[in-house]
Amino acid sequence: MPAMVPGWNHGNITRSKAEELLSRAGKDGSFLVRASESIPRAYALCVLFRNCVYTYRILPNEDDKFTVQASEGVPMRFFTKLDQLIEFYKKENMGLVTHLQFPVPLEEEDAIDEPEEDTESVMSPPELPPRNIPVSGGPCEAKDLPLPTENPRAPEVTRLSLSETLFQRLQSMDTSGLPEEHLKAIQDYLSTQLMLDSDFLKTGSSNLPHLKKLTSLLCKELHGEVIRTLPSLESLQRLFDQQLSPGLRPRPQVPGEANPITMVAKLSQLTSLLSSIEDKVKALLHEGSESTNRRSLIPPVTFEVKSESLGIPQKMHLKVDVESGKLIIKKSRDGSEDKFYSHKKILQLIKSQKFLNKLVILVETEKEKILRKEYVFSDSKKREGFCQLLQQMKNKHSEQSEPDMITIFIGTWNMGNAPPPKKITSWFLSKGQGKTRDDSADYIPHDIYVIGTQEDPLGEKEWLEILRHSLQEVTSMTFKTVAIHTLWNIRIVVLAKPEHENRISHICTDNVKTGIANTLGNKGAVGVSFMFNGTSLGFVNSHLTSGSEKKLRRNQNYMNILRFLALGDKKLSPFNITHRFTHLFWLGDLNYRVELPTWEAEAIIQKIKQQQYSDLLAHDQLLLERKEQEVFLHFEEEEITFAPTYRFERLTRDKYAYTKQKATGMKYNLPSWCDRVLWKSYPLVHVVCQSYGSTSDIMTSDHSPVFATFEAGVTSQFVSKNGPGAVDSQGQIEFLACYATLKTKSQTKFYLELHSSCLESFVKSQEGENEEGDEGELVVRFGETLPKLKPIISDPEYLLDQHILISIKSSDSDESYGEGCIALRLETTESQLPIYTPLTHHGEMTGHFRGEIKLQTSEGKMREKLYDFVKTERDESSGMKCLKNLTSHDPMRQWEPAGRVPACGISSLNEIINPNYIGMGPFGQPLHGKSTLSPDQQLTAWSYDQLPKDSSLGPGRGEGPPTPPSQPPLSPKKFSSSTANRGSCPRVQETRPGDLGKVEALPQEDLPLTKPEMFENPLYGSVSPFPKLVPRKEQESPKMMRKEPPPCPDPGVSSPSIMLPKAQEVENVKGTSKQAPVPVFGPTPRIRSFTCSSSAEGRMPSGDKSQGKPKAPASSQAPVPVKRPVKPSRSEMSQQTTPIPAPRPPLPVKSPAVLQLQHSKGRDYRDNTELPHHGKHRQEESLLGRTAMQ
């Protein structure tokens, strides 16, 4: 019982919470006992001495006696109870660092108001889920009724008492629906015939003739209906049966006696027939669709677009035929085909980020020339629908046997204990408010559907049938059930395409109760995890505590779920679910509210009507708690652009019901975004949120369903190319000069555990050396003692997709003090590269891990992934939007997570390009001095947290720290492009400016590109194929940190390092301190260099919030070395005044076929907001033979 638990026994509190409580106590000898995190049934005794916490493990033996784990040679003492152990060690000099003196009591605030947690459900009977309790009384009910006791010894009185009891029960029932003759027959049976049947039983007979007579009378009409219905059903069955069964031929119906046995047989036959008919119709329809319609599940879709020819906009039509794998270009919708391109000839889709309806398509002609075609769609949704259809086409006709990308639908809905409407297909089509899918994508089925419900009144089979039927209606496909798991009325269902059935394995389900006293299942979470080929996926559906004032309780709910939900690989015991999965999706009714005074309810309603969501999101509890790193640490959420999903009046979406009369008074439920979808993925893996919104036409609940769809990168079950039995010993992973910084007061030694699926088993290191850090932190250095890791497969296609999980553990208790993740997708092999990951434990930030890594792989290269097919070019307008992936309100901009780092070039293998990674600089460091945002919008990296004090190494692979605002690059290196991610805000992608000659293609619309790497803005990097010269000062001190943020030039003002296209203009650059706007010369190629930040002079102070406007550099500043202009192509020779020869740089490793497409002039829309079809620039279709590029 709780009352008997000693005050010093804190149960399952975390280690960090124990340290906090002891530090708060502040007295030497303060102590508490908590459950061990590493050994079941064991405890940890925590003692404070000289501001350090010492932890002793209390172990049970086979006889359930307790002992404190001691060093070798120290005698062990056993105690039958914990109380006896504590009393013993209160004596001095018993072996502890100090004797136990001051027990730290339990915090009782949670227990005081815990029963009120679900008051709303308890006090609102209509909202309770219905129960299928039989109306007829059972034995328990009969015992509750008083029995007459006048003469208990008379047997006939006993029979009369039973009769009277049943009569009373019949009278208490609602019999208004019974026919009068049926009711009279039942009463007659109870009055006389019940006793006669009783006499039959006493004689040993098993028959109840009078009861049979009663049921025959009641079923008389039913018998006639069955006799009349059966022939019709048999005829219908034969109609759909392909092979006639002799047993089902029509036979003459002989009127039989309406007795119960006959009725049961007939009803059984009727039930069997109905089931058989349904199965046969389903089979017939399925076979018919397979043979006739299956190949046209996705019909051809035509898009009306605009294209320019000689500056004149022309209307065009793009027809996408997914099934035949063709993109058809027509001048009129119903006209003949002008030309078409097969899926193999469509090389790249490049989305403009400045103009969200503009798209560039790179296609290959029959003469092996690369053609760049630019189109403007009617809106951004049409462009997204077109891209999804093209991606589906590439995927459908891919020569790869296994997918490297899947799409996932996530849906969450609090059903309000009401059955759903008949039609819920808008939910699965992502239709309604917010970021929704275009109609053209309706026919594209997702690979996996995950549906989470709360307050779900239906049974599992009933709900599953509704879901499968709705998806069948939407996709014409029957989905396989992967898992279904229910806790109380919290449920999660996972469905997958039939073709993925053999790719899904290791399915695991679990639940955690967080309701009253953490025992009742009125609140909590359910989860499902599984492997999709080589990728681990996890899904959590939670229903957290309600009530605006119970924010801290919700935070605790989240922590409990995080800690105790057992999903995924059991070998990863040191890690919770945030590190066990490549992709983790968290959905549900999280119940976080808009925290505003109740008297502002009507003002909130008006802001919702005016769609001023950002004003309300500034007070959203979940966003504020995430900003403070209290919950969902390192999770991401798409920008919210839909109305609050709670609390509506039922059967309408036009009115919020924000008041509710309770027994305790008026309760306010201000409109809030209670229903959310968040996710967390390993570093350097592809994940893009394609839609996030709520439906508008499903109104049976006071919540609206919420949908989110994702592209997620997956890996295959890789088989080594060395063949069976071959020894793959070329690969090696080496960690060097690693150290961890921990936020702890514990006095103990630490070691590392390294886990990965690319290792045969986990690896344990030697103990590190402890040092005193800043602000009470502890620094643990591992130096050169870490073991070298031997991967099971060293092929780069496999190894570079892997991750290493790191856990730093105490040598005394084997408890983890922090966990992190390092990606092996390195820029180059055979070199030491910096690495970084934040360390977390039970959802709290506990420190950082830094060091260097050296990766050795076998020969090979990375193949192109499907998600590389769609890229996004960046321009300056995107900088102002890219902090909107959390919300659009200003308070969040200081905390916005950056995108994932791109996959970078591998000098000896192949270039790895992925547009959805964290911004990384040279050798994994942030791109210092090459900021893409203004100072107040500096993107942080993976960890989302404050800039660590020691940034000498810079972030490396994995969850990096915030990008320092200004540090010189080591050497020029190519930039990779960014892809569309989170709507208008892609993940920032910055790659190392290291190897000479590797440069990014210009994103100018007419300009042919090197593969899909699109950068047009000098803020983001060089777009010339020529190397960038680095100032001597930067070469001499590549790792010097500077506090000043880099300047962010105005669109019309060139940076000191912007190269002009002509020689005389270059001289002007050297002689001026304030640069004039860059002139745009017709078709003349415009050459750009990297934006330089070689010194701190002329830089704005770190606190400047000038939104990227630069200060003029000092006049004494040395001129920046300038790259030579590009030699124009032959098609442009006639338009240039003075050709300037220049030596060609080394060819990039990847896609040399389109290198020279960088040499033509494109349009520049940075200085105006005019759309491309307004006729200011020339047509940008240029052809260039591949042979000319060698």
Swiss-Prot record:
It catalyses: a 1,2-diacyl-sn-glycero-3-phospho-(1D-myo-inositol-3,4,5-trisphosphate) + H2O = a 1,2-diacyl-sn-glycero-3-phospho-(1D-myo-inositol-3,4-bisphosphate) + phosphate; 1D-myo-inositol 1,3,4,5-tetrakisphosphate + H2O = 1D-myo-inositol 1,3,4-trisphosphate + phosphate; a 1,2-diacyl-sn-glycero-3-phospho-(1D-myo-inositol-4,5-bisphosphate) + H2O = a 1,2-diacyl-sn-glycero-3-phospho-(1D-myo-inositol 4-phosphate) + phosphate. Its main location: cytoplasm. Keywords: Apoptosis, Cell membrane, Cytoplasm, Cytoskeleton, Hydrolase, Immunity, Lipid metabolism, Membrane, Phosphoprotein, Repeat, SH2 domain, SH3-binding. InterPro entries: Endo/exonu/phosph_ase_sf, IPPc, SH2, SH2_dom_sf. Tyrosine phosphorylated by the members of the SRC family after exposure to a diverse array of extracellular stimuli such as cytokines, growth factors, antibodies, chemokines, integrin ligands and hypertonic and oxidative stress. Phosphorylated upon IgG receptor FCGR2B-binding. Its EC number is 3.1.3.86, 3.1.3.56, 3.1.3.36. The modification Phosphothreonine is found at residue 963. It is found in: Cytoplasm; Cell membrane; Membrane raft; Cytoplasm, Cytoskeleton. One of its GO terms (cellular component) is membrane raft. A motif (SH3-binding 1) lies at residues 126-131. Pfam families: C2_SHIP1-2_2nd (PF24147), C2_SHIP1-2_first (PF24150), Exo_endo_phos2 (PF22669), SH2 (PF00017). It is a peripheral membrane protein. The keyword Metal-binding does not apply. A motif (SH3-binding 3) lies at residues 1038-1049. Residues 8-104 form the SH2 domain. Residues 989-998, 1031-1045, 1161-1183 have a biased composition (Basic and acidic residues). Residues 111-130, 946-1190 are annotated as: Disordered. A motif (NPXY motif 1) lies at residues 914-917. Phosphatidylinositol (PtdIns) phosphatase that specifically hydrolyzes the 5-phosphate of phosphatidylinositol-3,4,5-trisphosphate (PtdIns(3,4,5)P3) to produce PtdIns(3,4)P2, thereby negatively regulating the PI3K (phosphoinositide 3-kinase) pathways. Also able to hydrolyze the 5-phosphate of phosphatidylinositol-4,5-bisphosphate (PtdIns(4,5)P3) and inositol 1,3,4,5-tetrakisphosphate. Acts as a negative regulator of B-cell antigen receptor signaling. This is Phosphatidylinositol 3,4,5-trisphosphate 5-phosphatase 1. The gene is Inpp5d.
